[in-house]
Amino acid sequence: MASPHSPSHASASFLDALDGGPRLPADHPPIETGRVGVLLVNLGTPDATDYWSMRRYLKEFLSDRRVIEVPRLVWWPILNLIILTTRPGRKGRDYDTIWNREKNEGPLKTVTRSQAELLAHRLAEAGDRLVIDWAMRYGNPSIASRLEALTRRGCERILVVPLYPQYAAATTATVAD
């Protein structure tokens, strides 16, 4: 029997949970079950390091009421007249120092994609019944676009997994919104 900490035990437990119980005996007749999507969600990253890409990303991120809890009447001029005119250039230069040039993307996108690919590989025994994908709360690929893609791929249920280490309204709650 596999150790409770072994990879095969972990994936078997996960698959059991999806099925609603323990695995069936080998001689049991097949049971049709629908596809399940697992969507890993991380915070986000701009599409590029140029001024307009950074501005678009910062506007989406800093317009979220869960992230900035200042009254809109006060926040709108600060965001649009100060932050979005001065910060995109500076933040773009900062991002440029850590940008993944090989894939032309931010490091968080690279890491999140890799996590989804590794999870899909580890859970491959589920066959095409389990579909793993990933999204960004701010930026691309968006949660909405990936939920739509999972639905098009025939997923009857979708489990959304925020990749944050703890609960906070500005992170986990905004994914659920």
Regions found by a protein language model. Give the residues of each.
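Active-site-proximal alpha-helix that buttresses catalytic centers in soluble enzyme cores
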Residues: 2-177
